[in-house]
Design a protein with these regions (language model features):
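Short alpha-helical segments and helix-capping/turn motifs at coil-helix boundaries
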Residues: 7, 82-83, 137
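Surface-exposed short loop/turn segments
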Residues: 102-160
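C-terminal/domain-edge helix-coil "capping" segments
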Residues: 29-43, 139-226
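N-terminal secretory signal peptides that target proteins for export/translocation
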Residues: 1-10
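Bacterial N-terminal signal peptides
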Residues: 14-25
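N-terminal segment of the mature soluble domain
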Residues: 53-113
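Post-signal peptide N-terminal segment of mature Sec-exported envelope proteins
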Residues: 38-57
Length: 226
């Protein structure tokens, strides 16, 4: 079974922003994840039908790869929520069905060092001889992040059964402190469910909170990338 690696495509500031979004919540009880999504939709998508057959987009990955099949199954509710049908292995396929190519992976550990500077008053002496001096103190923290990527490309089926015309393209990224892709995928699904196959008008950023006892909490964040 292939373990796909996430390749850092596009501007690296996107990954830095996802890390910075997480810093205020790293001490929270429930796990927090930084998620971004960028989706495009072509004019032919509205008339192309709503049935899709999943195909692996990772080079060298077979359709019977266990991880690919597991990821496709977890994506099915997102397709259903958007009014699409995702045909899995046991369902009969038709030549008129569209295709969706699924690419995904996880990065190597991303070690980041953050330094916090503060000034602490240091006082000595008494009465008129009392003096105060502000002393600079630095606190250094090391955090290890993992970046996961998921790319879904919807297209028509060509006469030879391969990739036809592009219909839509949805790319989603997730940053967290878990080193397992399937764990990071759980944080991506609530955002994907709202934006799959849509036109987002650019990249949008979210903080997702996952709690075993409650539904995921998704909060959109306004960020500025220089």
């Amino acid at each position: 079974m292939i373990r796909p690696r996430f390749r850092h495509t596009g501007r690296p500031c996107c990954l830095i922003l996802l890390c910075l979004l997480l810093l205020p919540w790293l001490g929270a009880c429930a796990p927090q994840y930084g998620v971004s999504v960028d989706s495009l939709r072509g004019p032919q998508a509205d008339s192309a039908g709503t049935v899709y057959v999943p195909r692996p987009g990772v080079e060298g990955m077979a359709e019977d790869d266990l991880l690919f099949r597991d990821v496709a199954a977890q994506l099915e509710p997102c397709f259903t929520a958007r009014g699409y049908t995702l045909k899995l292995d046991e369902q009969t396929q038709d030549k008129s069905d569209n295709l969706v190519f699924i690419s995904f992976g996880i990065s190597e550990p991303d070690v980041r060092i953050y330094t916090t500077v503060s000034y602490v008053p240091y006082t000595w002496g008494r009465g008129h001889f009392r003096h105060t001096r502000w002393v600079r103190e630095e606190e250094t923290r090391t955090k290890v992040f993992f970046h996961a990527g998921l790319l879904l490309e919807g297209c028509t089926r060509a006469p030879d059964g391969g990739r036809g015309k592009n219909l839509w393209r949805t790319e989603i990224r997730c940053t967290g402190q878990d080193d397992d892709f399937r764990t990071l995928l759980q944080a991506m699904l609530p955002v994907l469910q709202q934006h799959l196959g849509k036109d987002t008008g650019g990249r949008r950023y979210f903080v997702v909170t996952l709690d075993e006892d409650e539904a995921p909490v998704v909060e959109e964040k306004e960020v500025t990338a220089n």
